[in-house]
């Protein structure tokens, strides 16, 4: 990077070796489009290592559940719950133009903040603290000065040998038709509230950014995650939060079963704490417990100033609730990457679930079929007469597309025409699924091709990906 050896103080900490970039917005609203504060799609141009980069961003719709709420407590102990409008939010997912393997998870609220993958390398980006300037810093996590070099670990130590052997990847076919939907409540304890000096807006922004990353990570597992609520214990803890992760997890699960689950519709709850948990532990969750009133929970320590790392820890603990184990040596999520389910939190780019996690998650779902994640959260409680062309997928509809552009379904009913199997996708050809074994995504480098499975229009990820 141009500023090697120099140091700068950013929100994520002191950063050595960074590059100053000036992202330039290059998109314009389509003619006649309604102006939103944050557009549905945006593009930015800047340079990384002298190479021009075009970052394409799409608003992460569905990030918040339909009944999303925020709760805090008054000094006299009263619970105060609001339902803010969050449709026009500023959290995006994206990719780099001309880099098929690229990804991005970006907050565009005040400049660009988040991370993106470019040419196999993961970079962080955030605005520099310079008034009246568009300057941003781009850097790698390895260049953030570490306060604590000790290994940080998940506290789950279950004996995995008690599990039955799982299916081979070739026997497990998961398609978008199997999609599951998980609504999550994030509970912030009083130590977190104190750590952020009682700034609830800052805490919520921190959680929004993490939720954006979590949602992107779970896309690979065909699980759609959304935030059902954020609850901040602003006056005092409602359970005994201890340095023992095990005791805190048990208390939190019991509180959820007797309190939270009766007032907020959700599938899973995670406690975020600034309490320094015993030893190297920074997270703990029950295993294979999704939908259980007491056990569909986890506890995570807010252990890093880098949002991405805390987000991945949350994603890790939630995955335990979904029956996913720690990765072993044979598990892979791409060459050179440390996968999300590593038992040790690695400062490398941890953003992807491994092939093992994919199989274990769906092996658990297929066997146990946890019921709470079957229902797709609707954006309203109203079930209206099915009509095409709106954004809401209403009861009885197969698709929500512009009928004039798609001959595969009936515009009057929004149901597939007789004989049509699909409307679009790499494995859909004139309304019919392509044959099983047809290549739908070519391999990059030493990776493997992805193939159509004959039962979906989408291109499923090859479970044997390197």
Swiss-Prot record:
Disulfide bonds join 291-372, 331-356, 333-339, 422-428, 427-452, 440-459. Residues 1-6 form the signal peptide. Pfam families: Disintegrin (PF00200), Pep_M12B_propep (PF01562), Reprolysin (PF01421). It is found in: Secreted. A motif (Cell attachment site) lies at residues 444-446. GO terms for cellular component: extracellular region; plasma membrane. One of its GO terms (biological process) is proteolysis. The disintegrin belongs to the medium disintegrin subfamily. This is Zinc metalloproteinase/disintegrin. The lineage of its organism: Eukaryota, Metazoa, Chordata, Craniata, Vertebrata.
